[in-house]
C-alpha cells in the first residue's frame, strides 16, 4: 500500500509500505478515502511537534478521516472514524473525560500512525456509519465539527448569548455554525485573512473584522458591553488579547487554538478586573453522534473544502495548508464513491 510518513520537520515522504497484518478481534480493516489536514497536523509538519511532544520516529499523520470498512460489523459501508483511543478504565475516563485520558492514543500524533495510508485497522466502537447524503470529505470533517461542538460546550454558551469567534479557520467557521444552532444571539468573527472573513460571512456571521480593530469593533457593536462568550481558535497571544478586550465583565473565554510554542500570554490586569474565566479545549469528547446530527441539520462541511490532492502529492497538500491560501485542504486516498460503497477487496498480504 501507499503511505505518507513524516520523518522530520517538513520531511513528508510518500512510499510503498507493507499492508496491515492480522486484524484483532473487535477491530476492522479500513480503506481510507478522505483525510483533512488539521492545524495540529501542521504543527507536527512545521514545528516538529506540539508542546513537549516531538517527532521521535517517522509517523503517518492524519486524524480527520473517512473510510470504507473492508471487514467487521460495517463491512461495505462508509464510516467516519473517531481518531482517539482512550484507555476507558482510568479515573479520568470513568469520570467521562475520555478526551483527557492520560494514556490516550491519537491517530497521527506521537506513536500511533494516522490515516494518510491506504489501509489501517481501527476499533469497531469508534466507527460511525455515514449516511448517503454526506460526502467522504464531510465524513472526514466530522472530526473538526466535533471539536467545534466541544468548544461551544466549554464556552457555556446560552441561548441569546453574544459570541465572538477569534480565528476563522475551519474550526472557527464550524464553531460559528454550531453557535448559531445553539441559539446564540449575535455572532461576531475576528480574522486576519480576507478569504476566511468571506467564508465566515457566508457561514452566518453577523459581522467580521480584521484583528487591528477587532476588539474595538466588538465593543462598539455591543454598546460597550462586550460579548458573553469567546471561542479563541487562532492560537496566538494577540488572539487571546483580543478575546480579553472584547469580553464583558464575568465573561468566559474558551481557548481552542494551539500555540506554536508551549506558552501563551494574556493581559492579566484587564482579565482580572473583568473577572474572566478561561477554559481549555482539548480535542473533543464523544461528539460524533451530535456531529452527525448537526451535519444532517445543515451544518455545511463541504463548504470548507477548497483544495484537494491525491495521496501521492501529500507533501504538496501540506505545503498548501501551511500557506493558508484556502480553508480546508483534503487528501484523497481512495474513492468511497460518495454514497453507499461496495466492499473493497482486502489488500494482498
Model-derived features: positions:
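C-terminal hydrophobic helical "lid"/dimerization subdomain
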Residues: 1-3, 241-244, 285-349
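N-terminal glycine-rich cofactor-binding segment
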Residues: 5-22, 39-66, 80, 101-113
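Glycine-rich beta-strand-centered segment in the early N-terminal region that forms part
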Residues: 20-35, 50-91, 131-133
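Mid-domain Rossmann-like dinucleotide-binding core that forms the NAD(H)/NADP(H) cofactor-binding site
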Residues: 76, 134-213
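NAD(P)H dinucleotide-binding glycine-rich loop of Rossmann-like/cofactor-binding domains
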Residues: 87-166
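Glycine-rich cofactor phosphate-binding loops and adjacent beta1-alpha1 units
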Residues: 155, 198, 203-277
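Residues in the short beta-alpha loop(s) of Rossmann-like NAD(P)-binding domains
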Residues: 192-193, 259, 284
